[in-house]
Design a protein with these regions (language model features):
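Active-site cleft segment of glycoside hydrolase catalytic domains centered on the general acid/base Glu
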Residues: 84-87, 114-221, 226-228, 240-258, ...
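Active-site beta-loop-alpha junctions enriched in small/polar residues
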Residues: 36-38, 75-77, 107-109, 159-164, ...
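Bacterial N-terminal signal peptides
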Residues: 9-18
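Aromatic-lined substrate-binding rim segments of carbohydrate-active enzymes
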Residues: 54-113, 175-198, 249-254, 258, ...
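Boundary/entry segment of secreted carbohydrate-active catalytic domains
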Residues: 25-58
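Bacterial N-terminal signal peptides that target proteins for export
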Residues: 1-10
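Hydrophobic faces of well-ordered beta-strands that scaffold small-molecule active sites
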Residues: 31-33, 70-72, 102-106, 155-159, ...
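Aromatic-rich peripheral "rim/lid" segments of glycoside hydrolase catalytic domains that contact
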Residues: 43-47, 112, 262, 280-292, ...
Length: 344
């Protein structure tokens, strides 16, 4: 019997999505990395190796480590060209050749966007609200059309990066202009669906252990009619402890899993850990923590979390949460290899 019909019948009989949702969802649990900085490292002459010291291209190494997808950020007009739509195409082609799924992460900025900064692109700085929606939609469409024209399939699209406080400030700052943040988000949603109707559109927030910020944003988006298909979360025990949100990493794991169960039920959408990371200087402990994050996402969210993505594992130096040393993966990355070997 067709599995979709079985699921539909069960839903009708049981009358509750949660009772059978985990069984009916697609069996693939996605394991991935945001390796957007790869081409910049290559331009600097950096050679990446596997743990044995054999030269590797970064995308291929991620697959070798057990990953089945990658995440790529897009900036509007980056001054050096990295993370432009053309740069994203370079990386997307590599992923396609390897049979890996692709997530596109729109920052809607010329540079980094996160809860502490969501700067309007320089070319858009004088736009009014309607013009801003049009610019956002145009940028979204043009980027995705470039990918589609080159035979790239995009499975997920983030409309904004860690938009805990909205984006495109001050116009889209959620605390002051939730209606405009919602309108801008919905403009992005519509643009994605024009190009990739089947793509899953994600709204992404930080600090998955804190339910209050999720209620604030998603209650607001629902109030003003913004559409989204999935909630993306960041899970960083290191930053949670630094911000005094938790006492230890165990608390982060427990609280993020509980929050994902809660928001999937409250808002009727699926979830994904679209960013995570652990301390690079503590690789053995880091592997343990990452294994627990993956395990919690996969087995303790009532089947409503669809994957875990490590942010910039190849990044070394001042960034404390990479997973490489001397341009080689540490034991931290074994958590993905072991998770990939686990039977569904």
């Amino acid at each position: 019997m067709d599995i979709k019909r079985v699921c539909l019948l069960l839903l009708i009989v049981v009358g509750a999505v949660g009772a059978v949702g985990a069984w009916c969802q697609a069996s693939t649990f996605w394991l991935g990395a945001d390796i957007s900085g790869t081409t910049e490292l290559e331009a600097k002459g950096v050679q990446i190796y596997n743990a044995k010291g054999e030269p590797r291209e970064n995308t291929a190494l991620m697959k070798e480590l057990g990953m089945n997808m990658i995440r790529l950020r897009v900036w509007v007009n980056p001054k050096d060209g990295f993370s432009s739509k053309e740069d994203v195409l370079v990386m997307a082609k590599r992923a396609k050749e390897l049979g890996m799924a692709i997530m596109i992460d729109f920052h809607y900025s010329d540079w980094w966007a996160d809860p502490g900064k969501q700067n309007i692109p320089q070319a858009w700085k004088d736009y009014n609200y309607e013009q801003m929606k049009q610019a956002l939609a145009r940028h979204t469409r043009e980027t995705l059309q470039l990918l589609k024209a080159n035979g790239i399939d995009v499975k997920w699209v983030q409309v904004g990066n860690e938009t805990t406080n909205g984006f495109l400030w001050p116009m889209g700052r959620a605390q002051e202009h939730m209606d405009q943040y919602a309108g801008l988000t919905d403009a992005g949603y519509a643009a994605v669906k024009e190009v990739y109707p089947q793509a899953t559109v994600i709204v992404h927030l930080d600090c998955a252990c804190d339910p209050h910020r999720y209620d604030f944003i998603f209650d607001g988006l629902r109030k003003y009619g913004a559409r989204f298909d999935m909630i993306g979360v960041s899970v960083y025990p290191y930053w949670d402890m630094d911000s005094k949100l938790v006492n230890d990493w165990h608390e982060t794991v427990e609280k993020f899993a509980a929050n994902l169960r809660r928001i999937s039920q409250k808002y009727g959408v699926e979830t994904m850990v679209v960013e995570t990371g652990v301390e690079a200087k503590k690789p053995v402990e880091g592997k343990v923590i990452l294994k627990e994050i993956i395990n919690a996402a996969k087995h303790h969210t009532d089947g409503h979390c669809h994957g875990v993505i490590y942010w910039a594992p190849e990044l070394e130096g001042q960034y404390p949460l990479g997973a490489f040393e001397n341009h080689r993966p540490t034991v931290i990355m074994e958590a993905f290899t072991e998770a990939a070997a686990e039977k569904e």
